[in-house]
Curated annotation (Swiss-Prot):
Keywords: Calcium, Magnesium, Metal-binding, Thiamine pyrophosphate, Transferase. One of its GO terms (biological process) is pentose-phosphate shunt. It holds the Pfam family Transketolase_N. InterPro entries: THDP-binding (IPR029061), Transketo_C/PFOR_II (IPR009014), Transketolase-like_C_2 (IPR055152), Transketolase-like_Pyr-bd (IPR005475), Transketolase_bac-like (IPR005478), Transketolase_BS (IPR020826), Transketolase_CS (IPR049557), Transketolase_fam (IPR033247). GO terms for cellular component: cytosol; nucleus. The record marks H27, H261 as: Important for catalytic activity. It comes from Scheffersomyces stipitis (strain ATCC 58785 / CBS 6054 / NBRC 10063 / NRRL Y-11545) (Yeast). Homodimer. GO terms for molecular function: metal ion binding; transketolase activity. This is Transketolase. It catalyses: D-sedoheptulose 7-phosphate + D-glyceraldehyde 3-phosphate = aldehydo-D-ribose 5-phosphate + D-xylulose 5-phosphate. Belongs to the transketolase family. Its cofactor is Mg(2+); Ca(2+); Mn(2+); Co(2+).
Length: 677
């Protein structure tokens, strides 16, 4: 190790320690242990701090996000739009150095990590996207895409089940462009890993199909770490796990103990570190000039590499004008012109069809038009109907099951990993529009990943079928009740529950055009009629008046399968002398973004509003005065019988509508949309 290397590693360590000390909050242990690995990995990486969206950059993911003082120190030293002053504001309100990495706030952070295990799954998604992208656009003598994904992960990540799901799939997919580094420091918050984590990780990853490299002294041996990277790159048909034997809190008086994990070092400890490593013990946030020069040199080399890539891409566009134009369009974040003309349009004369089938029809129409759409299912393809006819599977060619240019991903029964991998695909860039299918109830298995989709502003899409008691015989274990309320309550998630074909097309239009908001499409197993008065344009507002009634006594607002039920209830109400209108509200988030004038035209003052949805009523008081829903678990049986059991029939809806009319008769009724703030 050269003296500059040693000085650089010490600088990384001390910047992290100083940042945590300044905040009086954070995690110094992992940065002290992983600094040599970070130094070695970044020296091998191809990136340009001045162009963080260059598509052929290598990606770095910090799965153990609590070690973010390490990442921030690297970003500062390499000249990203992050400075020592930002480090001094570590974990402070409004800073660019939050308590865990956030891709929306931290220049150079590829993904948002913190919940353990998510980052390694994101890394799998990034590597998958890179492989698909390369197989689609690379040509002989034109390696447009040949980047690597590097992931740091800790024992906590390995304990989380989601990492096992994703690592298993990565091994099957033979993602040789993925290199993960396990910080094997044998410490957890509760103490030694001997208390809860004693499995043979290496044997497990070998069984997944990963290549293994071990570095026995990752505290100091950067030559071995660099050699591990070189070895990993030679193994092109397996992802690699590099076991880094490290000491948590290396150099600290508390090194090797759980006490150094998540608390600032004491002042005397910091001083002895600085003295030991040749720094002024009274100075904080020091960056020696020779370290800056060394890192600037690597950046300059990388900028030359990017310039060569730019020239390569220019030549590519001349030799392959159609592909080049398509690729440029994707890099510009634009969709194909008039792609939405492919969306199916329906009339009431068309047959009743389940919205999951309508979803399949949409996918079959738009996938040929939009090459950036890729997707799959968590082993429910025949039920979710997520595979468009003729779509090739994304598989290693050696399996004989597909190839890397394939656009259909077999996720297996791995819902949580699927969600986190989708986040990684979105993080890769190139305008990927990716979707994953499962039953709506099992999107809950992936709640951690879904929440990070929303926080990260990744526009991924869940094709969530079997959306209610309408799935029938599988019973309450599979019938979602609270699921929609949960995800509607999560900020920045568009939860669509379309009622017919036009609304399903509108849902996909919203999802494909989204740039910052994930979507969940809740779709039926049972057939639904095509509605009179629906249209893609109307549904695209998130809510609209389906049945207009002058001087209505009541408005019934519903979603999905209950919209046609509400329409059927009108005849019953008419027989009772009650005039009712019907509003379809397929997506609350989109509706909420409309003008106040428009929203009040749909859900106006002066008329009581009843919501009808065969789910939890939680959250519906924002849009209705009275709520008819299902605040209990469902039942196993034939769907029509279950609907009848819970009185979700035209008569059941009409009964509750009549009671609502009677309750509000003679009273001043203010729209539930109105509020003081």
């Amino acid at each position: 190790m050269s003296s500059v290397d040693q000085k650089a590693i010490s600088t990384i360590r001390l910047l992290a320690v100083d940042a945590v000390a300044a905040a009086n909050s954070g995690h110094p242990g992992a940065p002290l242990g992983l600094a040599p690995a970070a130094h070695a990995v970044f020296k091998k990486m191809r990136f340009n701090p001045k162009d963080t969206k260059w598509i052929n950059r290598d990606r770095f993911v910090l799965s153990n996000g609590h070690a973010c003082a390490l990442l921030y120190s690297m970003l500062v030293l390499y000249g990203y739009d992050l400075t020592v002053e930002d480090l001094k504001k570590f974990r402070q309100l409004g800073s660019k150095t939050p308590g865990h990495p956030e891709n929306t706030d931290v220049p150079g952070a590829e993904v948002t990590t913190g919940p353990l295990g998510q980052g390694i799954c994101n890394g799998v998604g990034i590597a998958l996207a890179q492989a698909q992208f390369a197989a689609t656009y690379n040509k002989p003598d034109f390696p447009i895409s040949d980047s690597y994904t590097y992931v740091f992960l800790g024992d906590g990540c390995l304990m989380e089940g989601v990492s096992s799901e994703a690592s298993s799939l990565a091994g099957h997919l033979q993602l040789g462009n993925l290199i993960a580094f396990w910080d094997d420091n044998k410490i957890s918050i509760d103490g030694s890993t001997e208390v809860a984590f004693t499995e043979d990780v290496i044997a497990r990853y070998k069984s997944y199909g990963w290549h293994i490299v071990e570095v026995s002294d990752a505290d100091t041996d950067i030559t071995a770490i660099a050699a591990a990277i070189d070895e990993a790159k030679k193994v092109t048909n397996k992802p690699t796990l590099v076991r880094l034997t490290t000491t948590i809190g290396f150099g600290s008086l508390a090194q090797g103990t759980h006490g150094v994990h998540g608390a600032p070092l004491k002042a005397d400890d910091i001083k002895q570190l600085k003295t030991k490593w040749g720094f002024n013990p009274e100075e904080s946030f020091a960056v020696p000039a020779e370290v800056t020069a060394s890192y600037n040199e690597h950046v300059a080399e990388n900028q030359k590499i990017q310039q060569q890539w730019n020239e390569l891409f220019a030549a590519y566009k001349q030799k392959y004008p159609e592909l080049g134009a398509e690729l440029q369009r994707r890099l510009d974040g634009k969709l194909p012109e008039n792609w939405d003309k492919a969306l199916p349009v329906y009339t009431p004369a068309d047959a009743a069809v389940a919205t999951r089938k309508l979803s399949e029809i949409v996918l079959s129409k738009i996938i040929p038009e939009v090459p950036e759409i890729i997707g799959g299912s968590a082993d429910l393809t025949p039920s979710n109907l997520t595979k468009a006819k003729g779509t090739v599977d994304f598989q290693p060619a050696a399996t004989g099951l597909g190839d890397y240019s394939g656009r259909y991903i077999r996720y297996g029964v791995r819902e949580h990993a699927m969600g986190a991998i989708m986040n990684g695909i979105a993080a890769f860039g190139a305008n990927y529009k990716n979707y994953g299918g499962t039953f709506l109830n099992f999107v809950s298995y992936a709640a951690g990943a879904v929440r990070l989709s929303a926080l990260s502003e990744f526009p991924i899409t869940w094709v969530a079928t079997h959306d209610s008691i309408g799935l029938g015989e599988d019973g309450p274990t599979h019938q979602p009740i609270e699921t929609l309320a949960h995800f509607r309550a999560t900020p920045n998630i568009s939860v669509w529950r379309p009622a017919d074909g036009n609304e399903t097309s509108a849902a996909y239009k919203s999802a494909i055009e989204s740039t910052h908001t994930p979507h969940i499409l809740a779709l039926t197993r049972q057939n639904l009629p095509q509605l009179e008065g629906s249209s893609i344009e109307k549904a695209s507002k998130g809510g609209y008046t389906l049945v207009q009634q002058d001087k209505a006594d009541i408005i019934i607002v519903a979603t999905g399968s209950e919209v046609s039920l509400a329409v059927d209830a009108l005849k019953v109400l008419e027989g009772q002398g009650i005039k009712a209108g019907v509003v379809s509200l397929p997506d609350q988030l989109t509706f909420d973004k409309q003008s106040e004038e428009y929203k009040l035209s749909v859900l106006p003052d002066g008329v009581p509003i009843l919501s009808v949805e065969v789910m939890s009523t939680f959250g519906w008081s924002k849009y209705s005065h009275q709520q008819f829903g299902l605040n209990r678990f469902g039942a196993s049986g034939k769907a029509p019988e279950i609907f009848k059991l819970f009185e979700f029939t035209p008569e059941g809806v009409a009964e509750r509508a009549a009671k609502t009319v009677a309750f509000y008769k003679g009273k001043d009724v203010v729209s539930p949309l109105r509020s003081a703030f």
